[in-house]
């Protein structure tokens, strides 16, 4: 049997959106949904949904649509959500602490399994029943807990050093809030969340509209 084509990263990023919408549909008591109805909920075309799902096999029936519960189970299986994933959080400042306390993780198969910081004032504090450990303990705990996912919320100047330590300990996927690009070996995946960069991409549209309004003003 021929191996399925590797799906583009953008497709993988959309799958959690499909899963979230399907969960809402289940809560609403909806049993079947068309690709058009599902697409309307997340601003994706029906054709795009069908194409995305085609990377992983055949789903639904033409003219009938998708069984909501079954499709959700299939997508969760694709995303590896049929098991629990332990996660390490490094950097327990205001942001890191908020991440550690986020209840949504527990509802979606993500378990915070380790909290780490280098600041002596943070080490030993307890967050939701879990003690913040020294970053020096990260290697041991990550290996003992079998942690493969990590979230880092540290300053840019220390982000690469932290990343190197995590990768050496066995972490293979990192969500970074540090405003810098990280260097990682093949087989390690990094996602970035940089609020400033995101806001700057939005100010482009605001500035464009303001400049357009000035240009079209009768006084200009």
Swiss-Prot record:
Pfam families: CoA_binding, Put_DNA-bind_N. NAD(+) binds at residues 91-96. One of its GO terms (molecular function) is DNA-binding transcription factor activity. It comes from Roseiflexus sp. (strain RS-1). It is found in: Cytoplasm. One of its GO terms (biological process) is response to redox state. The gene is rex. Keywords: Cytoplasm, DNA-binding, NAD, Repressor, Transcription, Transcription regulation. Residues 17-56 bind DNA. This is Redox-sensing transcriptional repressor Rex. Coiled coil: none annotated. HAMAP family: Rex (MF_01131).
């Amino acid at each position: 049997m021929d191996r399925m084509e590797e799906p583009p990263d953008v497709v993988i990023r959309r799958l959690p959106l499909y899963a979230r919408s399907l969960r809402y549909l289940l809560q609403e008591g909806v049993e079947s949904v068309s690709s058009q109805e599902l697409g309307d909920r997340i601003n994706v075309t029906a054709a795009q949904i069908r194409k995305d799902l085609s990377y992983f096999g055949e789903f639904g029936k033409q003219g009938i649509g998708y069984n909501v519960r079954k499709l959700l189970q299939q997508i969760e299986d694709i995303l590896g959500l049929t098991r629990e994933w332990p996660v390490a959080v490094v950097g327990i400042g205001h942001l890191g602490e908020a991440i550690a306390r986020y209840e949504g993780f527990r509802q979606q198969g993500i378990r915070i399994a380790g909290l780490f910081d280098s600041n002596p004032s943070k080490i030993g504090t307890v967050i939701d029943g879990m003690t913040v450990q020294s970053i020096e303990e990260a290697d041991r705990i990550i290996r003992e807990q079998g942690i493969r996912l990590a979230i880092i919320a540290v300053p840019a100047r220390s982000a690469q050093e932290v990343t190197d330590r995590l990768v050496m300990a066995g972490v293979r996927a990192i969500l970074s809030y540090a405003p810098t690009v990280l260097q990682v070996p093949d087989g390690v995946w990094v996602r970035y969340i940089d609020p400033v960069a995101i806001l700057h991409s939005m100010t482009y549209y605001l500035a464009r509209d303001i400049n357009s309004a000035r240009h079209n003003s009768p006084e200009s």
